[in-house]
């Protein structure tokens, strides 16, 4: 095995260890991973420009059927509210309910506590470097998976 291949194997191993840890330790307790992604988008979205299910699907790379299934479950649990546009009745907006905001804030706080421990261990400079490298790695993977996509589409 070449040095390059060994480095790639080590990267794969580190990636797998992190993935197994995250899945095995259920860091998210009240929401699924996809629900956290959707809640995070809705939480940060200005209230005067609500999102549609289609927009959420585009941002998460989930299929329309997956988004609808997730949103229906979230609505059943009173985490989101759907409202029809007054301008176009075909358009339905999705917003977090108060319960959704509370639940998301609780999940977010738990994840932030873990990231605070990483930040404390690495220090600010290395944490900034890690963040930049993770973003760059995500971009590389996105471009590898879809070489025709622009970085704006990602």
Where are these regions (language model features)?
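N-terminal helix-turn-helix DNA-binding core of bacterial DNA-binding proteins
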Residues: 20-66
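Basic amphipathic alpha-helical segments that dock to polyanions
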Residues: 39, 56, 71-77
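N-terminal positioning helix adjacent to the helix-turn-helix/winged-helix DNA-binding module
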Residues: 7, 34-38, 52, 99, ...
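Alpha-helical macromolecular-interaction surfaces
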Residues: 13, 69-70, 132
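N-terminal leader segment of winged-helix/HTH proteins
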Residues: 1-29, 33, 40, 77
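Short glycine/proline-centered loop/turn elements that form peptide/ligand docking sites
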Residues: 31-32, 66-69, 73-76, 148-151
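Charged, amphipathic alpha-helical coiled-coil/dimerization segments
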Residues: 72-129
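Terminal interaction helix/tail motif
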Residues: 9, 109-154
């Amino acid at each position: 095995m070449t040095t390059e291949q060994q480095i790639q194997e080590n990267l794969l191993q580190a990636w797998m260890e992190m993935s197994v840890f995250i899945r095995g330790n259920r860091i998210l307790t009240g929401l699924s991973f996809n629900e956290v992604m959707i809640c995070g988008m809705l939480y940060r979205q200005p209230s005067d420009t609500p999102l549609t299910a289609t927009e959420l699907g585009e941002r998460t790379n989930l299929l329309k059927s997956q988004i609808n299934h997730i949103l229906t479950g979230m609505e059943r649990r009173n985490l989101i509210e759907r409202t029809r546009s007054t301008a176009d009745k075909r358009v339905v907006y999705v917003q977090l309910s108060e319960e959704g905001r509370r639940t998301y804030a609780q999940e977010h706080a738990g994840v932030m506590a873990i990231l605070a421990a990483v930040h404390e261990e690495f220090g600010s400079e290395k944490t900034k470097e890690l963040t930049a490298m993770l973003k760059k790695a995500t971009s590389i993977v996105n471009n590898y998976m879809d070489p025709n996509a622009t970085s704006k589409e990602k």
